[in-house]
Amino acid sequence: MVLSQEEPDSARGTSEAQPLGPAPTGAAPPPGPGPSDSPEAAVEKVEVELAGPATAEPHEPPEPPEGGWGWLVMLAAMWCNGSVFGIQNACGVLFVSMLETFGSKDDDKMVFKTAWVGSLSMGMIFFCCPIVSVFTDLFGCRKTAVVGAAVGFVGLMSSSFVSSIEPLYLTYGIIFACGCSFAYQPSLVILGHYFKKRLGLVNGIVTAGSSVFTILLPLLLRVLIDSVGLFYTLRVLCIFMFVLFLAGFTYRPLATSTKDKESGGSGSSLFSRKKFSPPKKIFNFAIFKVTAYAVWAVGIPLALFGYFVPYVHLMKHVNERFQDEKNKEVVLMCIGVTSGVGRLLFGRIADYVPGVKKVYLQVLSFFFIGLMSMMIPLCSIFGALIAVCLIMGLFDGCFISIMAPIAFELVGAQDVSQAIGFLLGFMSIPMTVGPPIAGLLRDKLGSYDVAFYLAGVPPLIGGAVLCFIPWIHSKKQREISKTTGKEKMEKMLENQNSLLSSSSGMFKKESDSII
């Protein structure tokens, strides 16, 4: 009778202890007298390890809806790309107007000084992106983009009240550019939340926004500058930033953010937890352990030392080389037209190129961008220069439209925000330095010929570096597959041995207690 009474007691003790452990649903309760015994604790520990993937499921981001509200998000992101980079790409028109407004015959370095305004602005947009990626992870795409557009509005409006070139370094080159950066980077990240299968096409459409604006803005700016002057033109451009401010409200979050992961959806504890997070929690430097991404983050900036030179100095070069030509702004329009075509065309092509092999499209684009830059000084007739600009714009669109899809392929959706942010930050250095160096060469040599020749060299070198990425990525994936297979087998054997030894120990203890 003693045996028949002790068995229910032990079963009751086990059932009462069951809710305290994190054992998964459907798992058999471990035999034994109670939770305090070490063999049962060992079994519970093994069960928790086995239940790991199941408990992580609620934090996984939902599947992209591939449409719906995403189409409105796409249009908002398209306006963002258009207003930010349309203004930047049309800076050649503003550059000439700044020379006329602030220049003096006594200053022989005015081209060099003025070039810093546009290049500093473009560089700061990319330089701030690593910081923007952190804000995007902390506060989401919507808040980051809206605040950025507001700051950009303030910077552009302030630029319309300066009386010399130097204050523009602060108002236009830093404040306006930082605001644009905070508005731009979330527009790349949010697309991956709403689209997956169509991501290449959607990125092509979004980045084509800057092409549309690059086509239209040079003519609009020329008309405005001739009619109302430089300062009122900058105030008109503030309207674009106000619309961008409104567009940012469409970035409704879908994927689980860092905020949700850390606080479990509790908004009150978000700031207190994140404010004192260690740096490694904020800046995800672990992505540089992905060798293919590290090579990509070096090759792209290396290729861009001469990339922005034509956008800043081409209009000045045309004024000097083709003085009799009217409508010189057509060269920037040509780049904008074919850049838009290239973004749509190569964005769609990228959807059919598997995995990291999309990088080969960027290699092709850098080859032609470098070659066309070298051909600009060789064009003795205006028609030839237009043809060169058309080809350059086509492959410029290719390079830009597939940047986000490649980042998704290299590091995955969870880390793509900071992956893009770090890359754009590295891009800021060559894009800031290149145009002033070209302006200095123009001041010293009297023409832009050498500047354009040298601007074509970095894209060729950077493209050669990018060729190694698919090989590095595939090699790493094979190593991971082999290692993962071995680890899974060893883990299964280890778990089985632990369960067997724990069970035998418990049965032995139970028999001892019965005796």
Curated annotation (Swiss-Prot):
Subcellular localization, as worded in the UniProt entry = Cell membrane; Basolateral cell membrane
Q: What does the UniProt record report as the effect of altering N81K in this chain?
A: Does not affect subcellular localization. Abolishes tryptophan import activity
Q: Spell out the reaction equation it catalyses.
A: 3,3',5-triiodo-L-thyronine(out) = 3,3',5-triiodo-L-thyronine(in); L-thyroxine(out) = L-thyroxine(in); L-tryptophan(in) = L-tryptophan(out); L-tyrosine(in) = L-tyrosine(out)
Let me know which tissues express this protein, per UniProt. Answer: Strongly expressed in kidney and skeletal muscle and at lower level in placenta and heart.
Magnesium found in the keyword field: no
- What parts of the sequence cross the membrane? 67-87, 115-135, 145-165, 172-192, 201-221, 229-249, 292-312, 330-350, 352-372, 397-417, 420-440, 452-472
Which residue windows does the record flag with biased composition (Pro residues)? 27-36
List all Low complexity biased stretches: 17-26
The primary location reported for this protein is membrane
Transmembrane helix among keywords: yes
**Residues with Phosphoserine modification:** S263, S498, S501, S503, S504
Modification after translation:
Not N-glycosylated.
**This protein's GO CC annotations:** basolateral plasma membrane; cell junction; intracellular membrane-bounded organelle; plasma membrane
The membrane-topology field of this record reads: Multi-pass membrane protein
**Which keywords does UniProt give here?**
Cell membrane, Membrane, Phosphoprotein, Transmembrane, Transmembrane helix, Transport
Q: What does this protein do?
A: Sodium- and proton-independent thyroid hormones and aromatic acids transporter. Mediates both uptake and efflux of 3,5,3'-triiodothyronine (T3) and 3,5,3',5'-tetraiodothyronine (T4) with high affinity, suggesting a role in the homeostasis of thyroid hormone levels. Responsible for low affinity bidirectional transport of the aromatic amino acids, such as phenylalanine, tyrosine, tryptophan and L-3,4-dihydroxyphenylalanine (L-dopa). Plays an important role in homeostasis of aromatic amino acids.
In the record, the note on similarity to other proteins reads:
Belongs to the major facilitator superfamily. Monocarboxylate porter (TC 2.A.1.13) family.
Instruction: Identify this protein by name.
Output: Monocarboxylate transporter 10
Give me the gene this protein comes from: SLC16A10
